[in-house]
Amino acid sequence: MDRIVVKGSGPLSGQIPIAGAKNTCLKLMCAALLSDEPLTLTNVPRLSDVATLSELLESLGVQIGRLDDGQTLAFSANTLTSQLAHYDIVRKLRASFNVLGPLLGRTGQAVVSLPGGCAIGARAVDFHITGLEAMGAKIELKDGYVHAAGDLKGAEIEFPFPSVGATENVMCAAVRAKGTTVIKNAAREPDTKALADCLIAMGADIEGAGTETMIVRGVDRLHGATHRVIADRIEMGTYMCAPGIAGGEVECLGGTRALVASLCDKMEAAGLEITETDAGLKVRHPGGRLKAVDVATAPFPGFPTDLQAQFMAMMCFADGTSVLEETIFENRFMHAPELIRMGASIDVQGNTARVTGVDRLRGAPVMATDLRASVSLILAGLAADGETTVNRVYHLDRGYEHLVRKLRGVGANVERLSDG
């Protein structure tokens, strides 16, 4: 099994190119099911999650062409041979559940396994189901599968919480439904807006994407399109935290402040300098110790839950005590015990973690528990004394393209080793 070894390496310097957004790309791939004409995606990140979803789409009859070393994918769903998304694939990747809306919208039926992915809480799919039921779908949960069927009609749907996955599943179903669907308390994430932009390019009639209220007018068919995947704001935010921990100056290429504004605000409050450039965002550590800053995760435009672990690693080196509140998922502080093994002072009570900065961390063998936890341990190792070995790094392959290469490119002492 692979592991990543990190040694404290001093200040970082250089540029890191940001890949296409994983979460956006996966939902765009599902949207290919809505049309019998090809959908071509560019700036595709080369990740194991993309490969897993490709496997699922191919099992449904989608043909996939791969160009530019996998950075361009062409999907042809002219003839779907199945409406069954099997457990063996869906269990590996939660985003696989988002074939439900497109399959139901196009074919009127779908059988989709309940999802898998990172082990970070229950992450129920209730909102997906109630939203589709409001549009007329008949849904039955049986033997771990969602059985859905029916001719969909426009409806007014208000989510109790702005769920990203539910908003996207309902939106994809609504573009092929009869009549108009109004989605209230919709997710405002850039990934959701990017999906709407792609659907519009395919001929969908959508208003209000990126706001709390979306209006989707159903159309008879969607045509093909070519669409570029936006920059990954979580990858970008991850690498922005690197100089906050190790010191130095790093420019993240390909994104904008608007994608990570909430993170920028907190990093500047901690004392880091952030400059928007023509190519991306530059983060500079001015020297000395950062100031402790409190964070509460929230739906976009709030602080992303997917950057909470990385920010915690940075606060381990800050002056004072920061309070991190996780409001999106339960059980998402699994990285805290591993940081404590490295000498961090962290007290977790329920959905709140109090992080008191320490003078230094010490390298130690640690275990990654999920995608974002794994990268937070690597970041912490950049400024720890000695050597940090992060085990179970297969999680990283789900969300970070060439992480070791990118960190080494700005001066980090990090390598990936295999037991063979």
UniProtKB/Swiss-Prot annotation:
GO biological process: cell division; cell wall organization; peptidoglycan biosynthetic process; regulation of cell shape; UDP-N-acetylgalactosamine biosynthetic process
Enzyme class: transferase
A cellular-component GO term for this protein: cytoplasm
PTM annotation (2-(S-cysteinyl)pyruvic acid O-phosphothioketal): residues: C118
Highest taxon of the lineage: Bacteria
Stored Pfam families: EPSP_synthase
Catalytic reaction(s) noted: phosphoenolpyruvate + UDP-N-acetyl-alpha-D-glucosamine = UDP-N-acetyl-3-O-(1-carboxyvinyl)-alpha-D-glucosamine + phosphate
Pathway: Cell wall biogenesis; peptidoglycan biosynthesis
Binding, UDP-N-acetyl-alpha-D-glucosamine: R94, D306, I328
Active-site residues, record numbering mapped to chain: C118 (proton donor)
Keyword Cytoplasm: yes
Keyword Cell division set for record: yes
Residues involved in phosphoenolpyruvate binding: K22, N23
Enzyme Commission numbers on file: 2.5.1.7
CDD domains registered for this protein in UniProt: UdpNAET
Any one GO molecular-function label of the UniProt entry: UDP-N-acetylglucosamine 1-carboxyvinyltransferase activity
Compartments, as annotated in UniProt: Cytoplasm
Keywords: Cell cycle, Cell division, Cell shape, Cell wall biogenesis/degradation, Cytoplasm, Peptidoglycan synthesis, Pyruvate, Transferase
HAMAP family hit by this protein: MurA (MF_00111)
NCBIfam families named among the record's database cross-references: murA (TIGR01072), PRK09369.1 (NF006873)
Biological role: Cell wall formation. Adds enolpyruvyl to UDP-N-acetylglucosamine.
Family per record: Belongs to the EPSP synthase family. MurA subfamily.
Name of the protein in question: UDP-N-acetylglucosamine 1-carboxyvinyltransferase
Record gene name: murA
